[in-house]
Amino acid sequence: MTTSPDSDHPLFDMDAPVSPTPVERLLALAGLYAQHNDRIDLWLHGRADLGPDAYAASARHLERATYGCITTVQKQRLPVTEPVASAVVRLKQIAHLTSGATRYLSTAQPVVPDADAKRGVPGPRRRLARCFQLARDLTALAAPAIIDSATCIAHRLPADAHSSSPATPGIDSARRDVLVEVARGHVTAFQTMQMAYVQATRVDSGTLRDLEAEHLVRREPDSAPSPYHGGAPYDRVRLTALGITALSTAIHRPTRIGPSAARPALAPAPTPARTRAHR
C-alpha cells in the first residue's frame, strides 16, 4: 500500500534537466508520457493505491511540458513545410488532450460517501475507474506521436541541433530501431531481460541487454502491467539520458519500420513453452 504524495506533486520526478535541443526535449517528453500512462495502467490493474490528485498533478506537468516543447520547436528556423506544420499541430493536439485528461483526473472522487458505504454501494470505485480510464485513453498515443513529431523535426534541423553532446558511435539501424521502440514506450522486460516484448510480441532480448550494458536503456522494475490477466507487473525499458542523446543523433535516419508497423524491429525469438508466470 503506497501513500499518496502531496496533491501538488506528480507521481514521479518530472524535473529532469531541460535539454537545449528540441529533439532531446521531445524524446524526454515522450518518456514522461509513457511513464505516466504506465502508472495509470497499474492503478487500473489494482497495482497502485495513490489518490487521483497525484495523477492529476502529473498530467498538469505534462501539459505544461508539451507547450514548452512546442515553444522550443517554434523558435527554430525550420522550413515552412506541411510535414513540419503537421508535427507542430500533432504536439498541440497532445497538449489539448492532456488538458482533458487533467480535468478527468482532477474531478475524480476517491472517497466513498458514508451513506453509500453503509448501503454497500459499489458505484464510487467504478466511477473513479471510469475517470482514470477516460484520462488514460486521452494520452494513450502521446509517446508514439511525440516520437513521430521528433523524427519529422529532426529531418529538418541541422545535425548540430539534434543533440547537446557528441554523437554516440555504433548506433546502427537495428540498434536505432530498438531505441525508437523504447522511446515509444513499447518495450517491456521480464526475468532480468531474459524475455523482452515490443507491445505483445516476444522478441530476442540480446540487443536490449547490450544497450543496457552501454547505459543507453534502463529497466524500471514492476512499472508496467503484465500482458497476462492477473500477472505480476513487468519491467518497462526506458531511455537513459545517454540513450536520449544517442537517439537524438540517429533518429533522423531512415527506419526499417513505420510508425504504425505491427511488428518490431527486433528479431523474434524462438517460441518456448509457456512458463507458469505467463499462464
Regions found by a protein language model. Name each.
Residues D38, L42-A129:
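Long, low-complexity or tandemly repetitive, helically biased scaffold regions used
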Residues G230-T271:
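Short, amphipathic alpha-helical interaction segments positioned at domain boundaries
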Residues A161-A213:
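Short amphipathic alpha-helical interface segments
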Residues M1-G68:
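Leu/Val/Ala/Ile-rich N-terminal alpha-helices, chiefly Sec-type signal peptides and the beginnings
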Residues L29-R39, H96-S106, L134-I153, L179:
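Hydrophobic alpha-helical membrane segments, chiefly transmembrane helices and signal peptide h-regions
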Residues P124-T168:
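Long, low-complexity, charged/polar intrinsically disordered regions in eukaryotic proteins
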Residues E212-P227:
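A short, conserved structural fragment
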